Amino acid sequence: MRRNSLNHVALILDGNGRWAKKRHQPRIFGHQQGAKVIKHLIDYALNDYVKYLTLFCFSLENWNRPQAEVKFLHSLFYQKIVSKKTLDFFLKKNICFKWLGFKTKLSKKLLDAIKLLEKKTAKNNKLTLTIAFNYGGRQDLDSKKRISSFLPNVDLLIRTGNENRISNFILYQLAYAEIIFEKTFWPDYTKKTWKQNIKEYHLRKRRFGAILPKK
């Protein structure tokens, strides 16, 4: 089987709230569980030699959610950013951390923490992990300097949560991406799910507008 190159995988981490609702839990419980899955996802990507992993965690449109949920998501992101466990994990795994987003409405405390983690992991080069937080693709394209310009084209976009849209994610980089709409809610995403998604990707015939030669 011919294998497509897999340099950049992007994910829209969707379904946390609905996952929690099915268990009669508050939405923030789903976000807590979903955050735990990210560490495992990083290992899956490393094992498959992915060089860029980009995760959509909070969009500009997400400010329209209930204030308590928005506040919790920002607090959760900050806690993960400043955690020594996070830094140790990134250094051990040789991961370069990047943030993709707009500074609007974000606290100085959070922005300073992001900048520090980026600085401490800047020399790592096995995997570039980009967290898109407070980001919008259209706003990015409309800005004077495209803030996502450091990212290469996406090979595979996976959206969990049984929703079939790209929700204003990195529009420029998604131009020729293969897209998989995964039914699994994000907190239930496992290594088996990842392997199924990657297998499906490698079965695709990527043409980039051309006609593939006959064998």
Language model segments and positions:
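Flexible, compositionally biased loop and terminal segments
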Residues: 1-215
